[in-house]
């Protein structure tokens, strides 16, 4: 029986990349290049589809070129965990550390709780800019991949 999940059958070619881009567009709202209108539910994927697909291809090529597997993932800015879960489907990280405030506003609780499951995740509920948080996160490293998508204050 063939495995029809797009993340299980990664192919480093243009046709697969276009197919993956269409999948990501369907997950995103129109404001960021997708097909869905944002309804305020916090259940949409909040990344630019082209950027996330290019990132996945870049990381897969990095693994192949270096003959390594990305195993330890640090994400700064977990939000509802959609990005975290999506990347984990492609890389099946051995260890995931995520740092973010846990704020009830703007995040769908069902999406949040569903994205805490089925992976080796440690969620640190703290301010990623504080020295104590940085120290705690450092102790849990080293990391093969760090994705920064938090603290959008630009201060």
Predicted segments with their positions:
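A short alpha-helical cap/connector motif
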Residues: 1-147, 151-155
